[in-house]
Structure formats: C-alpha cells, structure tokens
Amino acid sequence: MKLIGITGMPGSGKSAIINLAKENNIPVVSMGDIVRHETLKQGLILNPENVGKTAIFLRKLHGKEAIVVPCLKYIFEKYKNEKFVVIEGIRSIYEVNYLKKHVFLEIIAIHSSPKTRFERLSARNREDDSNSLDTFIERDNRELDFSIGSVISLADYVVVNEEEYDKFLENLNSLLKKIIMNVDE
C-alpha cells in the first residue's frame, strides 16, 4: 500500500486533491475528521477554538502521534487491499515519521498565501472556520506549533494554488496520475 499524504495550511486548497482522488476511486481518510469527531464526543460545538483545543488535548493525552495512530489503524482495517490511500491533514513531522515507519508515504503540500487563504476560509463558511482575522492568525499559529511548516518543507511535491482554479486542478490531476502511474506525463 502507498499512502499519499496531503498537507497544507487551512484554506490552501487541499479539498481539490481530495475530490480528484475520489473521482479516481482512491479512498480518502481525513485526520481532521478524527479531531472533529472527538470534539463532538466531548459535547463541544464545532468551531475553530474547540477543534483546536481538542487537537491539543489529544496530543497532550496521547503524545504527538495521537491523531495518526488511530488513522493508520483505520486505514489498515478498512483499506488493506487498496494500492493507494490518500490521507489528508498531516500536520506534524512526528506523524510523517510514524507513517513512514509503517507504510510507503509520499507527501503533497498545497501552498497558498495567507491573504488568499483568509479570503477562502471567510467564504467557505465551514463550522470550524472563522471570518475573523485574529482567529485566522491564531489558527495558523496553532498549525505552525504542530510543526506543519516542517511537513510542508519536506514534502515530495509542492503545488502552489494562487492561479486560476482550472489550471490548479489540471496540475493536481497530472501530479496524482504521475504518482499513481509512477511515470512522468
């Protein structure tokens, strides 16, 4: 099995590659879903503050691999016969190291400027997003505290999402095919 890890700051455009993976019948597992699930289990509403606090709590309680361990277990149980699985939401170098100990992993980082990301997050209106600049900056700092910057800098591929959306999708689709086929187009 080969894992295709997706990383990037909130609002960078990670959902585009998730949608492409699904269109290509590649299973997708989101690490954020585990955190959101745990937030709800604690009886909290989904908002940036509660989701962030839950992520920090889980890491304090179970260590720096707190999110990735149940994720990989889930992948092995549910998708053991798949050649490829996309895992979205890798945020720390500890998660990368854990995954690489257990499975072949290639990482795609999606990058967008803070200005672009803030505009997207303000517009998409997901429960754990905010249109407050202060909350946006807080969230970015929390992500950076998890060491997402290290994951992005060590990614096997970096795709910049500042251009026209169709061109971005075209670039992502080509990259996904390259990884799956293991050939250059």
Swiss-Prot record:
Transmembrane region(s): none
Disulfide topology: none
Keywords, alphabetical: ATP-binding, Nucleotide-binding
Binding site for ATP: 8-15
GO molecular function, one term: ATP binding
Keyword presence, Nucleotide-binding: yes
InterPro entries membership: NTP_hydrolase-rel (IPR022970), P-loop_NTPase (IPR027417)
Entries under PANTHER family matching the protein: DEPHOSPHO-COA KINASE, UPF0200 PROTEIN MJ1399
HAMAP family the record matches: UPF0200
Family: Belongs to the UPF0200 family.
Protein name according to UniProt: UPF0200 protein Mevan_0592
Native source organism of the sequence: Methanococcus vannielii (strain ATCC 35089 / DSM 1224 / JCM 13029 / OCM 148 / SB)
